[in-house]
Each structure stands twice: as structure tokens, then as C-alpha cells.
Regions:
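C-terminal transmembrane-bundle signature of multipass membrane proteins
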Residues: 167-231
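Short, Lys/Arg-rich, polar N-terminal cytosolic tail immediately upstream
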Residues: 1-12
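Short, aromatic-rich membrane-interface segments at the entry and exit
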Residues: 36-44, 60-65, 84-89, 150-155, ...
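Short, hydrophobic transmembrane alpha-helix segments
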Residues: 27-39, 56-58, 79
């Protein structure tokens, strides 16, 4: 047990350990200050923080944690009538994370499965992914409108950026983190609007602010890893 903990400790860099610890402390403090936000949302935020640091390392464990986070977050979103978030995470992010987990395990870097083989997306591939995003977004617009989704504009933008993020993740491309960072910004706005009505949602606002910092690091680190893998 001690050897495993030592191995895990040495796996992360000093910066990554600081980033993870800071993220967990901020999320915990937010929950302590606003305990009415609910234990479920707190658990989701902690799982999310762990998933992002593993994803930033290109580790498939991150995708497994995203599946768990997506299911819990979908439940929290349902309680807020954010049906767009609920449908996006339960119906798109979780299944795509499962597909990404399979893809990452099938495409390891070297002999170890602890790091995925990273690839860059070409111009044609980017164009196809962007074009696919348009009909998906339009379809979700009508679905969300039918369900009377609160704050439908940011919800639709969240769908678009989430689709980009999960697709780039599946394709093992560093742009996944950039798309998730864009999604974080939209969700910050979404939960800010909810927090104005009820401060109980401030921990969710804090959650995605923390995720934004982690996703930015993920993008930077994946580009660094890609250079290392290419050398």
C-alpha cells in the first residue's frame, strides 16, 4: 500500500500536486461556506478535479472518473432544471468518455497504458468536426426548447463546446482541453446566473472556475507531452 502511494506521489510533478491540492481545498472551502449546495454536487466537484489532473497526464483513469462525474453532474443539473446540461452529460459526455476510455487504452504511448498516444488533428479533420457540431447543436436547441430549459442560450453554447471537447478527446487531440476550457467559461456564466437567484449554487460556480484552470494546464501539458512523444 505504501509503495503504491509512493508511486502515485512520484507520478505527479510538484506543480500538479500543488494544482490538485489547491483545487480540492478551494472546492472544500466553498462547500463548507455554502453547505446547502448539497453533498452530491460537492462529491461531483472533487471527482471532477481528480479526473482533470489524470486527463492532463493523458492517463485513461481520467476518462473513467469523467464517466462518474458526468452521471452525478447530470443529476445535479436536473435539480436546477438545466436540462441541457443533464442531457449533454448523461447522453453525450458520459458515453463519449466511455468510448474515449476504450480508445485511450487501445492506443497507449509505449508499453505502459498510463499515457495515451497523442496525435494532432489535420485541417480536414477539424473542418469535419466543426461541421458535425452544427447539426448537433441545432438538434439540441429544439430538444432543450421543448423541455423549457432555463437560460437556453448558454445551455446551447455548452452543448456545442461539450461536443467539440468529447470529440477531440476521442480523437486523442490536445484541443480537447481547449474546448473544455471554453465550456468551463460558458458554465461559469450559467451557474453565475443561477447563483444570482440562489447562493446555494455558488459552489458549482467555483467548481467550473477551478476546472478552467485545470483544463488550461491540460492543454499546455498535452502539447508538451506530444513534443516528448515525437522526439
Amino acid at each position: 500500500m505504501k509503495s503504491k502511494l509512493r508511486s502515485l506521489n512520484s507520478y505527479f510533478t510538484g506543480f500538479e500536486k500543488t494544482l490538485l491540492t489547491s483545487s480540492l481545498l478551494i472546492l472544500t472551502m466553498s462547500y463548507i461556506i455554502f453547505p446547502d449546495s448539497g453533498t452530491l454536487s460537492f462529491i461531483a466537484s472533487l471527482i471532477g478535479a481528480f479526473s482533470l489532473i489524470f486527463c492532463a497526464k493523458g492517463n485513461p483513469v481520467g476518462q473513467l472518473l469523467i464517466i462518474i462525474f458526468s452521471i452525478i453532474y447530470a443529476v445535479v443539473s436536473y435539480g436546477m432544471c438545466y436540462y441541457g446540461e443533464m442531457i449533454t452529460y448523461a447522453g453525450m459526455t458520459a458515453p463519449m468518455a466511455a468510448a474515449s476510455l476504450y480508445t485511450w487504452l487501445r492506443n497507449p504511448y509505449g508499453r505502459s497504458r498510463s499515457q495515451v498516444k497523442i496525435r494532432s488533428a489535420g485541417g480536414k479533420e477539424l473542418a469535419v468536426i466543426i461541421l458535425l457540431t452544427i447539426p448537433v447543436t441545432v438538434l439540441f436547441y429544439f430538444i432543450l426548447k421543448y423541455f423549457g430549459t432555463a437560460n437556453i442560450i448558454p445551455s446551447i453554447l455548452s452543448v456545442a463546446t461539450s461536443f467539440l471537447a468529447v470529440t477531440f478527446t476521442l480523437r486523442r487531440c490536445a484541443l480537447y482541453a481547449l474546448a473544455y476550457a471554453m465550456n468551463d467559461l460558458i458554465l461559469i456564466v450559467l451557474w453565475l446566473l443561477a447563483s444570482v437567484e440562489n447562493t446555494v449554487y455558488i459552489p458549482m460556480l467555483t467548481c467550473f472556475a477551478v476546472f478552467l484552470v485545470n483544463d488550461i494546464y491540460g492543454f499546455i501539458n498535452w502539447n508538451r507531452l506530444m513534443k516528448q512523444q515525437s522526439s
